[in-house]
Design a protein with these regions (language model features):
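Structural signal for hydrophobic
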Residues: 99, 106-109, 131, 187
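C-terminal active-site subregion of NodB/CE4 polysaccharide deacetylases
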Residues: 1-55, 61-62, 118-195
Length: 195
């Protein structure tokens, strides 16, 4: 989330976010698409020097009003993981379609933002599949292969549920770097806040 909520460490200030994106551009970092990340992790595909993947969870309104224009300004690919069940309270379908049409990858964060680790395999499949259906119907994204676990929460059924629901790669909340050979259903990310 990007905004000016100084008391919430889950929110990065807009000025710092702009500085960070400028730093990436000025210092030769190369933002990758999810497909490029997947090919690197699973198949060992080459990636450019200084690779970085920009992901944004939950689909807050600022994703459209702040993040999206900055991504367009710098020409950076990015992925936004949304909960279709929350559409209308944060983003609208029109905003999601516009971002998708203009190079932002829209991906699955579950129909509802619920902890997957608290659900049976069948309920996990249902939460993922319902979101897949909404992405196909509302945005035209058929067979979306990317998922981000709400709260980063998983259990022993989650990898299997993800596969059965058509997911090829799942993003975790644990901090770390992605490497060739990593479990594609447990891709680590680095939290970036007001630092």
């Amino acid at each position: 989330k990007v905004g000016d909520d100084k008391d919430n460490d889950a929110v990065i200030r807009e000025d710092l976010f702009r500085e960070q994106m400028k730093f990436l551009k000025d210092n030769g970092y190369n933002p990758l698409t999810m497909e490029q990340l997947y090919e690197y992790v699973v198949n060992g595909a080459a990636v450019p020097e200084k690779p970085v993947v920009l992901t944004f969870d939950d689909g807050y309104a600022d994703t459209y009003s702040i993040v999206y224009p900055i991504m367009k300004e710098y020409g950076f690919p990015a992925t936004v993981f949304i909960n279709p069940g929350d559409i209308g309270t944060r983003l609208t379908w029109d905003q999601v379609r516009e971002m998708h049409k203009n190079g932002i990858t829209i991906a699955n964060h579950g129909f509802q933002h619920i902890e997957m680790g608290q659900l049976s395999e069948a309920k996990q499949i249902e939460n993922i599949t319902k979101a897949q259906e909404a992405l196909a119907k509302e945005v035209g994204i058929k067979d979306n292969p990317w998922f981000c676990y709400p709260y980063g929460d998983k259990n022993e059924f989650t990898d299997s549920a993800s596969k059965k629901a058509g997911i090829k790669m799942g993003m975790a909340m644990k901090s770390g770097w992605a490497h060739t050979g990593d479990n594609p259903y447990n891709i680590l990310r680095v939290w970036v806040g007001n630092a």
